[in-house]
Amino acid sequence: MGKNKLLYPSLTLLLLLLLPTDASVSGKPQYMVLVPSLLHTETPEKGCLLLSHLNETVTVSASLESVRENRSLFTDVVAEKDLFHCVSFTLPRSPTSQEVMFLTIQVKGPTQEFKKRTTVLVKNEESLVFVQTDKPIYKPEQTVKFRIVLLDESFHPLNELVPLVYVEDPKGNRIAQWQNLEVENGLQQLTFPLSSEPFQGSYKVVVQKGSGGTAEHPFTVEEFVLPKFEVQVRMPKIITILEEEVQVSVCGLYTYGKPVPGRVTMNMCRKYRNPSNCYGEESNAVCEKFSGELNNEGCFSQQVNTKIFQLKRQEFEMKIEVEAKIQEEGTEVELTGKGATEITTTITKLSFVTVDSNLRRGIPFTGKVLLVDGKGVPMPNKVIFITANEANHNSNTTTDEHGLAQFSITTTKIKGTSLSIRVKYKDHSPCYGYQWLSEEHQDAYHSANLVFSRSNSFVYLEPLPRELPCGKTQTVQAHYVLKGQVLKDLKELVFYYLIMAKGGIVRSGTHTLPVEQGDMQGHFSMSVPVESDIAPVARLLIYAILPDGEVVGDSARYEIEHCLANKVGLNFSPGQSFPASQAHLRVTASPQSLCALRAVDQSVLLMRPEAELSAATVYNLLPVKDLSSFPSSVNQQEEDNEDCISHDNVYINGIMYFPVSNTNEKDMYSFLQDMGLKAFTNSKIHKPKICPQPEEHRIQHHTLLASPVRAEMGRNRDFVHFDDTSEPPTETVRKYFPETWIWDLVVVSSSGVHEVEVTVPDTITEWKAGALCLSRDTGLGLSPTASLRVFQPFFVELTMPYSVIRGEAFTLKATVLNYLPKCIRVSVQLEASPAFLAVPEKEQETYCICGNGRQTVSWAVTPKSLGNVNFTVSAEAVESQELCGSEVPVVPEHGRKDTIIKPLLVEPEGLEKEVIFNSLLCPSVDFVFLGAEDGGQVLRHFPPAAATDTAADAHDPARPGAKVSESLSLKLPPNVVEESARASFSVLGDILGSAMRNTQNLLQMPYGCGEQNMARFAPNIYVLDYLNETQQLTAELKSKAILYLNTGYQRQLLYKHFDGSYSTFGEHRGNSEGNTWLTAFVLKSFAQARGYIFIDEAHITEALTWLAQKQKSNGCFRSTGTLLNNAIKGGVDDEVTLSAYITIALLEMPLPVTHPVVRNALFCLDSAWKSAKEGSQGSHVYTKALLAYAFALAGNQERRTEVLTSLYEEAVKEDNTIHWTRPQKPRLLTEDIYQPRAPSAEVEMTAYVILAHVTAQPAPNPEDLKRATSIVKWISKQQNCQGGFSSTQDTVVALHALSRYGAATFTSARKAAQVTIQSSGTFSTKFQVENSNRLLLQQVSLPEVPGEYSMSVTGEGCVYLQTSLKYNILPKKDEFPFALEVQTLPQTCDGPKAHTSFQISLSVSYIGSRPASNMAIVDVKMVSGFIPLKPTVKMLERSNVSRTEVSNNHVLIYLDKVTNETLTLTFTVLQDIPVRDLKPAIVKVYDYYETDEFAVAEYSAPCSKDIGNA
């Protein structure tokens, strides 16, 4: 190493001496054409030509060559001696989104020719799309309003056809769609209504562009009450570990700007990095609590000592979090705000403000650094130290009042081709300790590369320190050093410059410099107007061609403010108004702009903050913001035609050194590459390269490089009053409380102004408004937010929940607020209504309220009607001689009475039940039902060629296109809750449509074990296979399914055992043994998923090996582990059933029948079937269904046919359907008016028969498909509203069967089908189903419940119809298969804590027809206002309880099984919100696999009648 350092300068000097010295080519014609390496179609692009010293007229031409065609871009005839200009050209749209093409530039004259060919990337211009909703969150039954905005890459509006727009709910259902939408002037507004009972959660609007890309915008649907005030937590953003105190303030501010009175509770915590759930809160975090009253400004401040938070300890997170709750005075409404402060070990920090990434030998290297403390505050008058070893530089300097310091480093004697600079303030602390943090003083590091020049002539651009603001002209200094020996007799030197932005050349220019004798050094300035055309990143290139053909230059990168050319303004006049008054909204923008306006209640934004639509978000849509290099597909090194340097190797001390080209040095070519520009030139832009030597002359060992190897650094040049004219009314009635007030389109006049007169809503709040404007000339513009505060000094407001239960009393609170300077006496009245019963808390006629005071009046209200019930409350200032304190109350001249009318949703009492009716109606399929025959059905096969064979056939009602009908009778049980019934009717064009949209939510029951996770995993494979086979798979559906597969794969590994097997709850639940059945399920699913996601082969190999070890000598498999579903044990031959299941799994992987494990397993099954045929007892239906499918997979058609024949002897044939039942199934409760869905095991076994039919080899015959169709009709009737079934295994097997059947019968050529549903009365609705909307969920509410309806389908294909009937019932004692008792401790309202806390004790046992249940779920609903204490729920997890969950006001307890022995479960609940006259809550226990085996009970809080007084 030492030799290398000593010899290094000598070798560098040697290379310099080897440069040619007779390179003068003065007067030789020079050509330089610069074109971006990325070109967009259908938009103007530029290429810049520089031709100098021409001695004849030449033609410059550019052509683009693709695999399809050659296209001329431009042709210029140049007669001038010197020329510099940029040519614009436009490429047509390409059939592919992007492709690499060859660009050829030719300069040709009578005596000379220059031609060069290189690659460029050509991309089709992408339209930029974004969506704006009128607000971020919606309630049920509200209308969602949204806008689609389409722009080109210059932000100008587009007229474009959008193929598809749709809205997707949280379950993945497509609930609204628009096809082939013509968007004009870049904007389209759409709306759709939410149903009364939509899924709650995150929705999204999806826009599919013509190019195939999509844009998405989320919104939320919830039941909510808007917050009236904001809780602001104010604390430092950052503190250092040396801080001893931190100031925290909590403030409450109403949306109309007034302070909130009340009390604050503040919890300040520093969490552990690795918290524990075992020891309560203190094992999660170190916390300190504070509380106090808010002051007159609505704030509470606390100086907190940081000692408790142990800022110097490592085991904590590096932040302190604050959660503050403000309880409003009078209403007890409590809202929460959060804040956090970061903890840093950085005490001081140095950073480079302006510094070049390159250096030029002989020119001082300068820069500027900034010193700040840990909080980012500049530190003045501090000494800092600068070190640059390669330049042998050590110095110090002092920061100025802004914390800045400049430095300069001499580069004349620099070693090597790069410079590393270190700037430090203080040395780091020498003290280190385990789990302790040390203070840090961050140094600044920078590396700069040497710029190569043959003549040591340079031009360089001065760095700028900051983002450049729009609307101003920026001066850029260009410095130059020019050697006289190369300038010779030149009179003037022209510098050329280009500015690139968004990947294209946008500006160009020149600067002429008079040439003086000798060496020249100086600078000149260039003025750059900063506008939107060069945002968000501008790259500036400057260069000049010297007389000898050398090109000198530099490039710089500047961050530009995100600005838009269309300057939009928005303001309200006046800025503060009374409710229901008139106001003006003034919009200013470019003339003739189309402006979209929006004004939203600030409370909505407090409820759900949204990402602000800003210039930055629009710029983020750009596919190319900055072309920092060549695209990777064209990033090969350009051919260098310049001469290489040849010389001998150097021998020193017996070692041979050979020179290499230095990779760190920058040359003109690298500056052009930084710009993303392809250069076509005969000038010298490359540094000299070493001529390659024969390989045999090289020394392979102990070779030292003539230049050090360093990583090349990227270039970084980072641098309230009322309007007197508005008179308030004497009395106000306020009933209009929109959440979105303004949602309009207006066109700005030719003067650039538009005024809208608006009526202010009745909400006392602040409205936040914005405008989005589009102009053909200037493009997009966005206004700053405009605010209008709506206020009156005397008003009343109501505090109500989102909804209440009929008959359940709640407290209605009306708060009267007086912001007048004087006291007033107020009368408050609640208008009586037959819809509710109201009892005032206090019988008081009037209340005294002084300035800035309030009074809350309460009523105990019991609703009597369902739906939206209006509450009307009036507050009136009355005349009185009774003093308010020492003051005589006044009656305001204006606004003496305020009336507010607000609705409240009243929901039915009791237990909600849902009944699903499914139908698969097929007016035209290959197989059509003709009617019943001998208790079964007859089907006819219509081959397509026989569509018009005979006249008789044409009139056959079963022919394709015939009408197929089915009746629908909606009935209600006698114990139905009055007015609670509602029904909806849905149409889908695909048999798997609902399931493929809901693969994560197929079951309406909890998930929490390894089997349930696989039930979510496996259907994704079947859906992907089905969509692939039917050519319906879209990129969006594929990505969603693959996401689910990846997450399911990772989750399933949690349940893996060390030996490769899997169990229901994994090893951590104390299960020492894997489960044979579940391991087989996982094995086949992982194997099938390999085609879509990465699956580690080790998991498959280990599971297969483990299963092989369980195979007995007769080929059958031993059962190990606990089966949660004991229905699989219900057959006569447990071993055969399990072996059949495992054999199926192995064949589905797929393993060949010749595989030893499979071959032996098939021997087991064949032997078992022979024994069953010969024996008198036969075989269980479940077992036979599995055997039929196993033999079908194995290709044993003889055995398959035998087993199917036996199965059909036991089939149940009714209503044109076929299915199978178990001989001894559990007794079902018979009091329901509707037959419950079939048990899980019966769906599963019936689905296996479908698979046996459609897996017939080599292909299913018409008879197989005929029978499969009959079975599918029955299976489809068992689906739930999510597309799943009762439980896990039936869902997995049935969806597998439906996907195979769907693929076997699918046709893409079908025409439309028309669906009609009509009642016996006047209601009738039609739907159209075709290929384009077959995945769209079309839905309508049914008006008559109870009622009689008929459903009919005409046209072609099968249509899946689903009706959902919901109603509430009052539960009653019955003969349940479970014994369930619920008690509360205490049972009565005794003791000081009974109002706020009690225990729920559950006793459960199984008394059904079986020895024990399968896995069971206990679902405990909380009474209103109470929440479970999670640690007490977690403590239930012991031998019989596998898992617990707390979700959506429910506690879910998983039981491995329930026997006749009583199991007792107890946990604690705490009061969250006081509620009066609590209704009982429901507890339900049910068998996970036999969901019709259940029991319900109810419990009441100990203090149900008076708990609201707590």
UniProtKB/Swiss-Prot annotation:
SMART domains: A2M (SM01360), A2M_N_2 (SM01359), A2M_recep (SM01361), Thiol-ester_cl (SM01419). Plasma. One of its GO terms (molecular function) is protease binding. Disulfide bonds join C48-C86, C251-C299, C269-C287, C470-C563, C595-C773, C644-C691, C823-C850, C848-C884, C922-C1358, C1116-C1164, C1389-C1503. GO terms for cellular component: extracellular space. It is found in: Secreted. Keywords: Disulfide bond, Glycoprotein, Protease inhibitor, Secreted, Serine protease inhibitor, Signal, Thioester bond. InterPro entries: A-macroglobulin_rcpt-bd, A-macroglobulin_rcpt-bd_sf, A2M/Complement_sys, A2M_N_BRD, A2M_TED, Alpha-macroglob_thiol-ester_cl, Alpha-macroglobulin_TED, Ig-like_fold. There is a cross-link at C1009-Q1012 (Isoglutamyl cysteine thioester (Cys-Gln)). Residues 706-711, 721-725, 732-737 are annotated as: Inhibitory. Its main location: secreted. Residues 692-730 are annotated as: Bait region. Residues 1-23 form the signal peptide. Homotetramer; disulfide-linked. Belongs to the protease inhibitor I39 (alpha-2-macroglobulin) family. This is Alpha-2-macroglobulin. The gene is A2M.
